[in-house]
C-alpha cells in the first residue's frame, strides 16, 4: 500500500538477485515478529513532496556517467529522534557518484543542501525499543559474503501516480 503522502524520489535500484537477497532478509525479520517491510530495496539520491523538474533534468544529465555503480556495506545507521526509527545499511560508493548525488541533492529546494548519506533502508517505522534486537536479527540473517551492492538503474519515481522514469541504466 502506497501512502498518498509518499514523496517523489530519485532512486537507485539493484539487480534482481540482490533485491531477492534483501527480500529474504525482510522475510526472516518478519518471521521473527518484526514489522513487515514491503518497500522495494533501493538507494535514495533525493526526495521532495513534489520534485522540481530541474532536479530530474540534472539527475538525467549526471547519473548515466556513474551508473552502474558499486556500493560497499560499511555498517548500520539509525535515523530518527522520535519514537519510530529507521534502520539502514550505511553504504560507501565512488567519489564520482558521491559528487553527482551531492549536486543533485543541492539542486533540490526541498533537499538537505549538498548532503548525501548513501544507505539502504532495512527497517521502516520501528519502535525505538526494538532497534537493538532488530539490528542483531538483521546481522544474523545477512550473509557475511553480502558486502557489495550494485546500482544498475537510476529512476525518478512518483508514488502518487505510480510513474517510474528511467534516468540511467535499466
Where are these regions (language model features)?
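Basic, often amphipathic N-terminal segments
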Residues: 1-72, 91-150, 163-170
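Glycine-rich beta-strand-turn "strand-cap" elements at beta-sheet edges
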Residues: 77-82, 151-163
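Short strand-loop-strand
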Residues: 81-84, 119
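A structured binding-face within diverse protein domains that lines the active/interaction site
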Residues: 85, 89
Amino acid at each position: 500500500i502506497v501512502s498518498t503522502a509518499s514523496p517523489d524520489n530519485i532512486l537507485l535500484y539493484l539487480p534482481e538477485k540482490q533485491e531477492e537477497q534483501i527480500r529474504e532478509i525482510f522475510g526472516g525479520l518478519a518471521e521473527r515478529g518484526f514489522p513487515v517491510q514491503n518497500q522495494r530495496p533501493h538507494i535514495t539520491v533525493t526526495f521532495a513532496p513534489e520534485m522540481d523538474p530541474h532536479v530530474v533534468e540534472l539527475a538525467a544529465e549526471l547519473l548515466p556517467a556513474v551508473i552502474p555503480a558499486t556500493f560497499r556495506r560499511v555498517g548500520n545507521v539509525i535515523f530518527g529522534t522520535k519514537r519510530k526509527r529507521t534502520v539502514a545499511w550505511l553504504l560507501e560508493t565512488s567519489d564520482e557518484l558521491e559528487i553527482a548525488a551531492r549536486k543533485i541533492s543541492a539542486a533540490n529546494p526541498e533537499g538537505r543542501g549538498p548532503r548525501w548519506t548513501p544507505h539502504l533502508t532495512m527497517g521502516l517505522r520501528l519502535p525505538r525499543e526494538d532497534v537493538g534486537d532488530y539490528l542483531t536479527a538483521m546481522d544474523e540473517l545477512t550473509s557475511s559474503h553480502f558486502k557489495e551492492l550494485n546500482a544498475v538503474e537510476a529512476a525518478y519515481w512518483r508514488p502518487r501516480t505510480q510513474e517510474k522514469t528511467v534516468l540511467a541504466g535499466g
